[in-house]
Amino acid sequence: GGGRRSGNRFFNCHSSHGVVDMNKAIAQSCDSYFYHFAQAVGFDQVADMASLFGMGKQFDLPVNSQFFGTVPNAAWKEKKFGRPWEPFDTVNASIGQGYYLASPLQLAVLSARLATGKALNPRLVMDGPAKDPMAYDFRPDDIAYIRQAMSDVVNGAGTARRAQLPLPDVKMAGKTGTAQVVSLSISDGRSGPWKYRDHGLFVFFAPFDNPRYAGAVVIEHGGGSGSAYPIARDVMTFLFDPQKGLEALRALEQQWGGTAQQRLEQRYAAYAAARGSTVKPPPRREEEIFDQVEAEARLAARQSEAIATDAIKPRGETSSVATPPSPAATPATEAPATPAPSATPPSVVPETTP
């Protein structure tokens, strides 16, 4: 493949692309293109634009575990390490490597802002209607150009052609990414020990020409973006056509050995059987769950009434209310007879404002 030299180091590109413009560089993920132009404009300008699109930011959400990440520049490196910014730092950071750190939420916000040209922020649906976001001072033609380039990643001669939606009227746009974990001298990133494999990333939005949803998928040690974009494809398929999305899920579940609930039940039963116990099957319908909860509540109420009656009677007088017997002690080898845990539903990607 191609690449670019910086000092005594040569930075590779994963392939040779020939003559490249921005559209082709985005669609085919040409690292050399971004190496060149980051050095041409200076990385401080690149870092400023990354911050504008949500990198390194905290959002107004009721969670304490947000990860700020890092958008490096010359001032940041000087403050943190006491060393100047070098040309090879620009090359590394131009494709998100080196000191760059980002969270999946930040990547999803980046995707939404790129798609719309507006300063969209994530919010909880129950917070009510979203405020009108500020529009960036971008030319409409520039926004349309980026949308088309990211559409070509999926629907053209790009790096995520297998991410095309099975929907004739909806096209998804995206960008593949690979976060290198260790040096290529240790691992090629695609195989070998799991801990040395690259992380797979994919940011996306759809429909590409009138965005409604945007999101990001990160698969740690997935070996590259090929582990990430099929998930984005299936999620977006479900959002636009739930029936078709569930059909794709059922085909996968057959390979996995059943639904998530069925696999959990099988593992739970095997765990109990290994300890000489059995488990009752969990309720199958909402009505059964409600009936079970109400029965337990009635039993608890009767026990409370019996205890209260005994407490107010004179000493020596026995209660006419029979207290239900305490449950027998569970043998040490018996597993709790509780329903198998329910599967957790997948997260839904943030909704953008067209």
Which functions belong to the PLM regions below?
Residues 130-134, 147-148, 229-315:
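Short, gly/Ser/Thr-rich active-site loops of penicillin-recognizing serine hydrolases
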Residues 219-223:
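A generic structural motif
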Residues 1-217, 267-275, 299, 309-319, ...:
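Beta-lactam-recognizing serine transpeptidase/beta-lactamase-like catalytic domain environment
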Residues 103-109, 227-234:
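Short amphipathic alpha-helical face segments that pack within enzyme cores
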Residues 72, 253, 280, 294, ...:
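N-terminal non-cleavable signal-anchor helices
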Residues 212, 224-226:
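Intrinsically disordered, low-complexity acidic/polar segments
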Residues 304-354:
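Long, low-complexity, intrinsically disordered segments
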